[in-house]
Amino acid sequence: RLLASPQYGERWGRHWLDVAGYADSEGYADADLEREWSYAYRDYVIRAFNNNMPYDQFVTEQLAGDELVNHPYENLSEEARRKLTATGFMRMAPDGTGSSGVDQMVARNEAIADSINVMTTSLIGLTVGCARCHNHRYDPISQEDYYRLRAILAPAMDWQAWRAPSQRQI
């Protein structure tokens, strides 16, 4: 009875949303701009829990859902929309690039670093932020490994072709 309840996904999905840093706003500046489409990611997580989605599929869709859908993104099936929505995971970190009065290059760099931090703490249980500047003192993460990981994400989080949060639907 409890597993069949729609509240099951809300209850247990909330734990994942906490780990993913889910927020309805950017969480960066005093203005704290609203993330207009963040609810879609929240609903994706709740549905995934209610539908008993396998964990490997859950993680794959969040990290690479856009790579699982063929271009162009027109006349999308419900499955394709789900996969694209799942990539909202990569945009849950604080992002100040839509705020006025901030250095955009610094804000973009911080948004990427925060996204890496969310991804690594939630999926591998390690903090890697220290490795931005030096080899991690306690975990086996070198500075070189950190920037290798960042290079993997570069196509999805291109700081030179950055879209402000208000220009995104994910």
Regions found by a protein language model. Name each.
Residues 1-170:
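Short, structured secondary-structure elements
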